């Protein structure tokens, strides 16, 4: 459960997000809005990116999220993916997962974790020995997104914010993505917030709520998902 009260985000004194009062309980939620309105900013600010100044209040499963350091937010169960995942030379995909699981006090059985990693990679159609390849280095956009899906499965957070998880994926990969996101939420007490403009993904996920951000940094949250389909057909000004 994530609840924001008059949550405002500023960069260099400029307001990007203005007095957002939103609630995200267990289930699937979609965030939409024109380019540049702060959809990615919302995720980064919640995760504790120091480039953003925040005001207001954010409660995460009963805890004051804004009082936590970034690593504490991760340990509390918050996970975000990125529009453009960063490559890290010299660090393999599995080494990254292994270290993350240690840091988050997750299962540290190397043999079991490696087996699970390889199974997830196979499910997603990634190359053999994907675990040994360097993190996001010489990987396509779609492969980077699949890598983040493996991370989501293995780190098993309480709440995940995925920034355009469908980017770079073909139709078959989108189908697998939907299956895995559904499986994640179906574990119970899991919250998934997705930033997407892809009609196929939104239709298949059938989200519980829709949040629309506008160019003034305001937000409207609704359970009327038909609005999403109208936007996809006619645009934000339609």
List where the protein language model places each region.
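Q-loop/switch helix immediately C-terminal to the Walker
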Residues: 84, 90-104
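Walker B catalytic motif
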Residues: 164-165, 172
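Conserved beta-strand-loop-alpha-helix hinge in the C-terminal portion
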Residues: 213-238
């Amino acid at each position: 459960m994530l609840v924001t009260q008059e949550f405002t985000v500023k960069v260099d004194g400029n307001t990007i997000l203005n007095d957002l009062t939103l609630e995200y309980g267990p289930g699937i939620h979609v965030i939409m809005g024109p380019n540049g309105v702060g959809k990615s900013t919302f995720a980064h600010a919640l995760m504790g990116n120091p480039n953003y100044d925040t005001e207001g209040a954010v409660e995460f499963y009963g805890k004051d999220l804004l009082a936590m350091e970034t690593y504490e937010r991760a340990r509390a169960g918050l996970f975000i993916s990125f529009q453009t995942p960063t490559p890290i030379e010299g660090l393999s995909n599995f080494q990254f997962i292994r270290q993350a699981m240690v840091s988050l006090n997750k299962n540290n059985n190397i043999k079991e974790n490696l087996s699970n990693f390889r199974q997830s990679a196979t499910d997603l159609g990634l190359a053999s020995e994907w675990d040994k390849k360097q993190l996001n280095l010489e990987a396509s956009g779609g492969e980077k997104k699949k890598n983040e899906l493996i991370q989501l499965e293995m780190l098993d957070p309480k709440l995940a914010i995925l920034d355009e998880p469908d980017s770079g994926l073909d139709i078959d990969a989108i189908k697998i993505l939907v299956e895995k996101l559904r499986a994640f939420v179906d574990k119970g007490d899991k919250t998934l917030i997705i930033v997407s403009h892809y009609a196929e993904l939104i239709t298949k996920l059938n989200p519980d709520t829709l949040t629309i951000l506008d160019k003034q940094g305001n937000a409207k949250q609704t359970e009327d998902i038909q609005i999403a389909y109208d936007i996809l057909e006619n645009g934000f000004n339609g």
